[in-house]
Amino acid sequence: MDIKTLTSGALIKHPSRGLLLGTGPFRESAEPPDSGPAFYIDTFRLDDPRPWKIPAALHALPAEGNPPPPAPEIRWAEPSPDAYAQVFAEMMEQIAAGQLMKSVPAIPQFGEMLLPHTPRELILRAISSSPSHYPYAWWTEREGFCGITPETLFHQQGRRLETMALAGTARPEDEGVFINDDKEIREHEIVAGSILSRLSPFGSVTRTARSVLNLGTLIHFVTYLTLESDEQHTPAHWIRLLHPTPALGSQPRTENTLAQLDDWRSRLRCPLHFGAPFGFLEDGDFFCLVGIRSLYWQGQRLALCTGGGVVASSTLTHEWRELKLKRDTVRRSFHLP
């Protein structure tokens, strides 16, 4: 099946079922279907009134697909630090005042893919990425997005829920310094602690020790958490409980801090789906990714968005450099110039 010729589709890599491709026409629904497969595709704000996208057909794709097409020519425009610097200053002011512990500004880099290449080719590049990542995509005739994320929001099988805290970033060659970096450790523990506190009222939670996850081009701190829930809950319940974690949201997480984050993201022109939940449901098994390491398109115009956590010890120069490091990592993951 030639993905480049499909006018609409949804794709995800499931941890046990591999690559799954949904093809249209899609039926959209406010609730998941009683049976059969469905994709969950929402915005970061969780404001899509019909986030369940039910495909006309579901296809299992081979793990070893066709090689990606020749690299396209993309004209990238360097993002200006001015708007980011203003948002960073406002965040630091609120942190100093005790109103915030952490927040995550996200800023895109814009570009244009030159014909005859089309952005749907990016999906083929995502599929051929590292096996330690999860490709995902959603597209219509004129727009769409795809990504290669290492981060899961959760995997629900009955009452069992598995999730992770993935926060703190460095280059692999800096691991010796990274494991003792107070700023990166604090950023990670804010995320892990927040997830633990949100899950604990619902049952028994186990947590692994903090460790380093090496993804080749970047390293992160990771903590895995497992909940044995006292009661059965819907995927929507867990999505609203966990999204956004402080890895992409604000801590503390209140209506006011989330509204402020939404304003900051809008001012930085962050795509609506960046960092949003992206999931797949079938037969009571719901697997949900965090939509990062991604590219968005309308026509031939592209946006490559990255975010980074800001805490009390953050500096503008360090955070701006980290955003560039993450953009470069995304490009390498897609084998792009």
Model regions: which residues?
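An anion-binding catalytic pocket shared by soluble metabolic enzymes
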Residues: 2-17, 107, 111-190, 282-307
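Conserved hydrophobic core element of enzyme catalytic domains
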Residues: 228-337
